[in-house]
Amino acid sequence: MLSDIAIAQRARLEPITKVAEQIGLGPEDLELYGRYKAKVADHVWPRVRSNPDGKLILVTAISPTPAGEGKTTVTVGLGQAMSRIGKRAIIALREPSLGPAFGVKGGAAGGGYSQVVPMDEINLHFTGDFHAVTAANNLLAAMIDNHLHQGNKLGLDPRQITFKRVLDMNDRALRSVVIGLGGKNGGVPRQEEFMITPASEVMATLCLAEDLADLKRRCGEIIVGYTYDGAPVRARDLKAEGAMATLLKEAIKPNLVQTLENTPAFVHGGPFANIAHGCNTVVATRLALKLADYVITEAGFGADLGAEKFIDIKCRLSGLRPDAVVVVATIRSLKMHGGLKKDDLAREDLEALQRGSANLMRHLRNVTEVFGLPAVVAINRFAADTEAEIALLRALVEEAGATAVVADVHARGGDGGIELAQRVVELVEQPNRFRFAYDDEDSLKTKIEKVATRIYGADGVDFTREASRMLKKLESEGFGRAPVCIAKTQYSFSDDPKKLGAPTGWRLTVREVRPSAGAGFVVALTGEIMTMPGLPPVPAAESIDVSDDGEITGLF
């Protein structure tokens, strides 16, 4: 089988103006970025906002392993399959980050015959949204240090500056640096940390904003640090929000592209799901619901992270409600959760599969029992999967009261997802008992405890002294009703990435709590979460090249 980029380069793309016709958009509704990419103009939303909403389908997954789950691939394949059975569908995805593309992951636009295209352009600079977020973030950072240099009228304590600079690249050397070393005219020396752009508060703020005016207001709410007296200093105190919103003016417009089978796709926004809330923009999701009968969206990593944050943060703050959930699982990954080594995954092992299925069952239970949503399991098929393994996994899922459907969308595109699409169409008509994992009125501490015990399976939560102090401080400052965003390893339900499967008999430790006031949530940090990744021993960048005539190779 051809590589992903080779398949993408051989695709027959339609002009984006023709793709837009499928969802009722004309050339005047688009701002073109070449022949195959466009932003949707501002005037479209007022015209369609009174349209009835389509059905919202959330695609999530088991806890990820190095064996790969293919959540984006299934999301794209399901959208293509919906089109094949005559449904008007739009796919709503996040934009990929440059850092992982050149690091360990490679490209992130689906795989095989279920990709969004132009794949190389989406994975690289796309329409410039990530660069705009980086610029807006670093403008605020520059204004903070300029304020210190120009006399510090606000009394901002350089030791308590919480807002960090960002770069959309994996660069461990920037995790901890000292700035302002240029002498008298070089600013105030202080320690600084860089984060990767998808981890930034500005990215989360963009993705949860309802429109440009709301985005500007939210930018002004960002807490950049604290005064010597402990009072919060916000971006609006530095008069930064107007310039930040100006830099983000184009970035808030949804990006329209297509799949290999010409199904429309909104690819917009890109916060990480282990550090941030892991969902595409509210703006793009809302617009898609007004233009399609079915909107298929995904949330990052496993259902304990992406799906929980999609529901408890994105849905809570926006009013969106999913109609059904697809939980993606692979037999390879479940065998790894069952204790099998990566090198042994190609051989049949029913015992390892049965042990590892506990991970899937906990995710499935969370979706159906905690959140009250109808769900189907999509078995993302790999060539080494045996009929006995598939039969066992189907039986285990049926025992749990759900249905498992094989999705062969990597190899067959939309044709390989027709059974899944038909099942989803049935699911969205089932009774929906949607609910959150916690209530707005719960204390911040209780919210964290409910997610840990109800979703992760923890026995309880331990808070460091500093985390407990910050929780009380945030509640006194008016953050008590905010949702919580728990920053946790994606590889385990627990805060220990080595505890695979569905661990029991453990407690979650919250070591730090910080406000993300622009986004509107409170972040609780657990374990060893890196906000600036590093490159691996052999970065993907070493295999990426471009020919003399401009053809890219090696990008996944």
Swiss-Prot record:
<keyword id="KW-0067">ATP-binding</keyword>
<keyword id="KW-0554">One-carbon metabolism</keyword>
<dbReference type="InterPro" id="IPR020628">
    <property type="entry name" value="Formate_THF_ligase_CS"/>
</dbReference>
<keyword id="KW-0547">Nucleotide-binding</keyword>
<dbReference type="Pfam" id="PF01268">
    <property type="entry name" value="FTHFS"/>
</dbReference>
<dbReference type="InterPro" id="IPR027417">
    <property type="entry name" value="P-loop_NTPase"/>
</dbReference>
<feature type="binding site">
    <location>
        <begin position="65"/>
        <end position="72"/>
    </location>
    <ligand>
        <name>ATP</name>
    </ligand>
</feature>
<protein>
    <recommendedName>
        <fullName>Formate--tetrahydrofolate ligase</fullName>
        <ecNumber>6.3.4.3</ecNumber>
    </recommendedName>
</protein>
<dbReference type="InterPro" id="IPR000559">
    <property type="entry name" value="Formate_THF_ligase"/>
</dbReference>
<keyword id="KW-0436">Ligase</keyword>
<comment type="similarity">
    <text>Belongs to the formate--tetrahydrofolate ligase family.</text>
</comment>
<comment type="pathway">
    <text>One-carbon metabolism; tetrahydrofolate interconversion.</text>
</comment>
<dbReference type="GO" id="GO:0005524">
    <property type="term" value="F:ATP binding"/>
</dbReference>
<dbReference type="GO" id="GO:0004329">
    <property type="term" value="F:formate-tetrahydrofolate ligase activity"/>
</dbReference>
<dbReference type="GO" id="GO:0035999">
    <property type="term" value="P:tetrahydrofolate interconversion"/>
</dbReference>
